[in-house]
Design a protein with these regions (language model features):
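Short acidic/polar mixed-charge low-complexity motifs
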Residues: 9, 37-41, 78, 90, ...
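DNA polymerase processivity clamps
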Residues: 21, 64-88, 136
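Beta-strand elements of well-folded, non-transmembrane domains
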Residues: 34-38, 49, 98-102, 116-118
């Protein structure tokens, strides 16, 4: 599990890697939980190991330079996404759209935005890179 927990914001990743699908762009079932100011979602994203690796590298650059952005988005389906954008003063804006893809016959969707201090990224980024860095192109 990969987790960021700050005041009024929690983001968790639960990846299931499907090595037999490495020839395809989507090979990770990424469980995602988010809670932002009391609004929450528990869903999944269909992404690839290379997409997560690139996202982790973007996050590392954002953390180290306090500039730029990092985005993880599904290549297909409803295009769920998570985005981190550097702001002034060492703050990081975290936003995204998560849709449950009509699980259980009903559509649920959350659009969220929050802000965290850069220090909350360090462990999250290091864990992602340790596990997914080898998949970077």
């Amino acid at each position: 599990m990969y987790r960021i927990e700050a005041d009024r914001f929690i983001l968790e990743f639960f990846p299931e890697i499907h090595e037999q699908d490495f020839a395809y762009p989507v090979n990770v079932y990424l469980g995602v939980k988010v809670s932002s100011y009391g609004y929450s979602a528990d869903t999944f994203m269909d992404v690839g190991v290379q997409g997560i690796a690139e996202f982790a590298l973007q996050l590392k650059n954002l953390y180290e330079t306090l500039s730029g952005e990092a985005r993880l988005e599904e290549p297909y389906s409803v295009h769920n996404y998570l985005e981190f954008v550097a702001e002034t003063g060492g703050h990081i804006r975290v936003m995204g759209r998560l849709n449950n893809k009509s699980a259980f016959g009903y559509t649920q969707e959350i659009n969220f935005e929050n802000e965290i201090d850069q220090t909350y990224l360090r462990d999250f980024v290091n864990l992602l890179l340790a596990d997914f860095g080898r998949y970077a192109e």
